[in-house]
């Protein structure tokens, strides 16, 4: 290990040794080693050296340069802006120009992006990021001060940005300092091992110092990404040209990019089949079926942590009784739903957020028995809770993607156990609402589509911790809060797995949210598109993508 000490901190070397032992003993797969190592900033050659592997070598066609890649995405709500961005579609529009600090890979690892390296202190309460030397479109140098200025705006309690919810209790406003032109030090509110993921995933886009809301739509935000915005129309889409000054321009083979907006998945699928677009970063499973049979297209897939929550507010009857929540959980045939909606191309859930896409999943699965359908047990629990004659409830949700089909199956399956569920499906705009009218947060019984997150903590912090801003189930558990926060701050991989088991077990037992499955990312592409990333669903890194025409 001595040869690596000049390249990594003592903490990284120590944890690297632990990862090596786990990998050599067979307790950890190659994928798990990549994920757990990359969050500490360990490079792939370093990780490969631990157990004697390097990056796999495959015989691949030589990339061709040129051409414009056309993508179809769901229409964003309103004008896209980095200050208010919250959805995948908005992220797809922003990220070609305003890229992430780290590039999240389909296998869950984190590759350098605008940040070329990162490291933490011994207890993961302080993180140091070193940024690449780059320049904005106007020729101004990109520096650590740009990131600090963006955070000043994004984390300001008065800001319109939703970004603050993901940082709550982790990083406070102004708790970071520029130590030199390319270095920024983050001083966290608590230990957080996955912090590099927090600043790298989702719809957050890093804009230049002096940015004013609305500048992006006006074409005034010349970014440091692989592409430069040429034209943006809120009702149609956006076009881009290659950025010749991008730090990795040699691996950007496309001359340009065009993003076209669509109102529904069926329209996107038809556009792909008709040649209007070349690839679809996200598509509902029901719309994928017809494409699967067409030899001109390929459907790329990757595991994801995205799920449709079936959540119950635990602070009022009938769902304040854990037995009612458990009864509904036992009434559902999870594998049947996965087979019916996804043709088996999804992972069965077990009422906790530690999805198979996460490195801790194997440990959790080994320790926590899978909940399966048991109608008799469901009826017994419902009777014990005082509902021997059954229970009538209204389930409020959104008319979006696969959600209606999913809830109709839940409605049908739960009936056998005594649940009489009435569905109230609203438009997405009405379900999420605004201000004091947000049904997804206020309705006693609801179902929400939660997009993937890069880490378990990124799922837990905004939605499951006591008092969290998007805690739609009103769940509050001191034991869970303690386990989840300890997990976030534990640097030892073995101890961290144990804490993941503790947190997952509490959620599974309390079941504020039924998580039936984790949907895989499905990306249909024309076969002329080469090197297109299979995932993750919320990111679109076009490094190495090219057109075989």
Residue map of PLM features:
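Extracytoplasmic/peripheral linker and loop segments enriched in polar/acidic and small residues
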Residues: 371-372, 422-431, 458-527, 549
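Ligand-site clamp/hinge motif
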Residues: 245-290, 420
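N-terminal secretory signal peptides
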Residues: 1-32
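Surface-exposed binding/hinge segments that line
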Residues: 130, 163-209
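Gly/Pro-rich hinge or "lid" segments in bacterial periplasmic/extracellular proteins
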Residues: 105-109, 191-192, 197-256, 264-266, ...
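Alpha-helical secondary-structure segments
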Residues: 70, 143-152, 181-187, 225-226, ...
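Structural transition elements
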Residues: 347-384, 402-405
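N-terminal lobe/hinge region of extracytoplasmic solute-binding protein
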Residues: 72-122, 152, 220-224
């Amino acid at each position: 290990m001595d040869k690596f000490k000049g390249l990594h901190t003592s903490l990284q070397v120590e944890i690297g040794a632990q990862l090596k032992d786990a990998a050599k003993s067979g307790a950890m797969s190659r994928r798990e080693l990549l994920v757990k190592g990359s969050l500490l900033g360990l490079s792939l050659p370093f990780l490969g050296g631990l157990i004697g592997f390097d990056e796999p070598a495959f015989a691949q066609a030589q990339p061709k340069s040129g051409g414009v890649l056309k993508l179809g995405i769901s229409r964003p709500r309103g004008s896209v802006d980095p200050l208010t961005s919250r959805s995948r579609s908005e992220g797809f529009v922003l990220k070609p120009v305003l890229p992430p600090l780290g590039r999240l890979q389909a296998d869950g690892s984190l590759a350098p992006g605008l940040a070329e390296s990162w490291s933490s202190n011994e207890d993961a309460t302080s993180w140091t990021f070193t940024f690449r030397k780059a320049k904005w479109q106007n020729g101004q140098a990109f520096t650590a001060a740009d990131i600090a200025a963006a955070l000043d705006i994004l984390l300001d309690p008065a800001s319109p940005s939703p970004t603050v919810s993901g940082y709550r209790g982790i990083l406070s406003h102004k708790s970071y300092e520029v130590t030199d032109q390319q270095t920024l030090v983050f001083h966290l509110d608590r230990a957080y091992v996955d912090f590099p993921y927090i600043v790298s995933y989702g719809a957050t886009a890093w804009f230049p110092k002096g940015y004013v809301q609305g500048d992006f739509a006006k074409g005034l935000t010349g970014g440091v990404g692989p592409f430069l915005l040429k034209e943006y129309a809120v009702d149609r889409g956006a076009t881009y040209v290659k950025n010749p000054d991008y730090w990795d321009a040699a691996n950007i083979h496309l001359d340009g990019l065009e993003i076209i907006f669509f109102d529904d998945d069926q329209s996107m699928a038809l556009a792909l089949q008709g040649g209007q677009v070349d690839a679809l970063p996200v598509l509902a499973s029901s719309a994928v079926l017809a494409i699967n049979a067409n030899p001109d297209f390929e459907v790329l897939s990757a595991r994801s942590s995205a799920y449709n929550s079936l959540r119950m507010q635990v602070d009022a009857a009938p769902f304040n009784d854990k037995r009612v929540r458990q009864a509904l959980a036992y009434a559902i045939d999870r594998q049947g739903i996965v087979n019916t909606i996804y043709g088996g191309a999804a992972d069965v859930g077990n009422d906790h957020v530690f999805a198979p896409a996460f490195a801790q999943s194997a440990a959790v699965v080994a320790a926590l028995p899978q909940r399966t359908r048991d109608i008799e047990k469901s009826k017994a629990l419902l009777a014990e809770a005082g509902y021997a004659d059954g229970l009538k409830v209204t389930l409020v949700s959104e008319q979006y993607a696969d959600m209606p089909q999913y809830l109709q199956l839940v409605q049908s399956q739960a009936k056998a156990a005594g649940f009489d569920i009435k569905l109230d499906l609203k438009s997405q705009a009405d379900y999420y609402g605004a201000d004091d009218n947000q049904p997804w947060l206020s309705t006693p019984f609801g179902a929400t589509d939660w997009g993937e997150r890069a880490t378990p903590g990124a799922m837990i912090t905004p939605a499951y911790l006591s008092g969290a801003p998007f805690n739609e189930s009103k769940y509050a558990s001191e034991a869970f809060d303690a386990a989840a926060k300890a997990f976030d701050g534990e640097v030892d991989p073995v101890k961290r797995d144990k804490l993941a088991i503790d947190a997952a077990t509490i959620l599974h037992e309390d079941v504020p949210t039924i998580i039936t499955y984790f949907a895989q990312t499905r990306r249909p592409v024309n076969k002329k598109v080469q090197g297109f990333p299979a995932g993750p669903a919320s990111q679109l890194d076009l490094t190495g993508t090219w057109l075989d025409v």
